[in-house]
């Protein structure tokens, strides 16, 4: 159980915020190795994409290997990151892309393991 005063501990919030932005930079340059590294290497990993679904790290690795580098730019809006204690964080953002009028939404659930922070669940969607 997390004490109420353990929400958004400054050092944990700073750590996750930096990882969130590093993930975004890796996504935009299609750094597949970095992207795969940030996701939990476990069959319980879940990622819902815009038009795809990966259940488990092996499916995610296969998806990333087949994905092309983005041919658009992305601007993030309304980034909201909340941490609970030293081991759990949720990151949400809205985004716009240069190739569509649709509005994007993204969420990531991060957990700190012995080998560092990992995304254990993620969701990306686009809406009118």
Where are these regions (language model features)?
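Surface-exposed, charged secondary-structure patches
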Residues: 12-15, 50-51, 59-103
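General beta-strand recognition
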Residues: 34, 46, 89-90, 118
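Short beta-strand segments enriched in hydrophobic/aromatic residues
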Residues: 39-40, 95-97, 123-126
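Structural motif
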Residues: 41, 84-85, 113
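Residue-level detector of high-confidence beta-strand sites
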Residues: 48-50, 122
